[in-house]
Amino acid sequence: MLIFISNMEELLIENSQRFTIFPIQHPECWNWYKKLESLTWTAQEVDMCKDIDDWEAMPKPQREFYKQILAFFVVADEIVIENLLTNFMREIKVKEVLYFYTMQAAQECVHSEAYSIQVKTLIPDEKEQQRIFSGIEKHPIIKKMAQWVRQWMDPDRNTLGERLVGFAAVEGILFQNHFVAIQFLKEQNIMPGLVSYNEFISRDEGVHCSFACFLISNYVYNIPEEKIIHKILKEAVELVDEFINYAFDKARGRVPGFSKEMLFQYIRYFTDNLCFMMQCKSIYKVGNPFPQMTKFFLNEVEKTNFFELRPTQYQNCVKDDAFAFKLFLNDDDF
């Protein structure tokens, strides 16, 4: 581990005199935590009953495209959780930041559960489910992306600043195009449950990504050189390009609402915004190819009354009775 550098970082310095969160010593970080706390939701609070008919009516090439996205998501969130639990939450000593990452880890667990529910609901065939749940083994590009994430999260090879840049790239660049692709289903007025999940998860991930950028700009002493930041971000973009090509090949190039060239441009537009948040020069200097979805891109999805969304007929949507029973236990069952 890079001790000679890491020991200079305020985030990693133990305060032996501080045992409680109050009095707050880092109010901006505390505000980030409270913002994240306000977004709390659970995976059971989205109804996917209508999605089953929409999914079955969807052309097979389009279904194949979205299956690749689900395969990525079920793997990616687990790797994010792994990094939080084994690295950041063990290393970070500033309590307000640690509170944020504790809340983020809980949210990522909700996201992971939500993706599993989506797979179980939409894909009844158990062998096909397993192919999606085993994304790293079955999809070479997903394995490559997972290896890249673990490479940049490794504390023995990278400074804290480099790892935070990599973390922002994961939460932002690697996820963003997939969020956009799912959101286009809303314009087709189909898959309302999947779209609702997507809006809640993308909103959460937007906060996670922005917080990483905030720490880089305000707390990291050893900020990576701009060329290193650009290297990390460009590597992430190249991986996304490769995934998009792979997913479009599976869909035989037919996905309603957008082309892969539009997704290529969008991820570069998004990456330039990340550069701005990290106080770096932009890399690609391209416009937004999806101006009609600006509100979604800015994570301005209105907070929903989740009690109104709480489903009452989920057992009819999930074809695995044992799985459904486990999902819908209430407090009286414990």
From Swiss-Prot:
Annotated binding of Fe cation 1, by residue: D77, E108, H111
Active site positions: Y115
Induction behaviour: Expressed in the early phase of the viral replicative cycle.
Cofactor entry: Fe cation
Residue ranges of the TM segments: none
Gene Ontology molecular function terms on file: metal ion binding; ribonucleoside-diphosphate reductase activity, thioredoxin disulfide as acceptor
GO biological process: one example: DNA replication
Keywords: Deoxyribonucleotide synthesis, DNA replication, Early protein, Iron, Metal-binding, Oxidoreductase, Viral DNA replication
Amino acids binding Fe cation 2: E108, E171, E205, H208
Annotated cofactor note: Binds 2 iron ions per subunit.
Keyword Oxidoreductase: yes
Pfam families in alphabetical order: Ribonuc_red_sm
Class in the EC hierarchy, top level: oxidoreductase
Keyword flag Membrane: no
Family to which this protein belongs: Belongs to the ribonucleoside diphosphate reductase small chain family.
Subunit structure as annotated in this protein's UniProt entry: Heterotetramer composed of a homodimer of the large subunit (R1) and a homodimer of the small subunit (R2). Larger multisubunit protein complex are also active, composed of (R1)n(R2)n.
Free-text function comment from the UniProt entry: Ribonucleoside-diphosphate reductase holoenzyme provides the precursors necessary for viral DNA synthesis. Allows virus growth in non-dividing cells. Catalyzes the biosynthesis of deoxyribonucleotides from the corresponding ribonucleotides.
Protein known as: Ribonucleoside-diphosphate reductase small chain
Lineage: Viruses, Varidnaviria, Bamfordvirae, Nucleocytoviricota, Pokkesviricetes
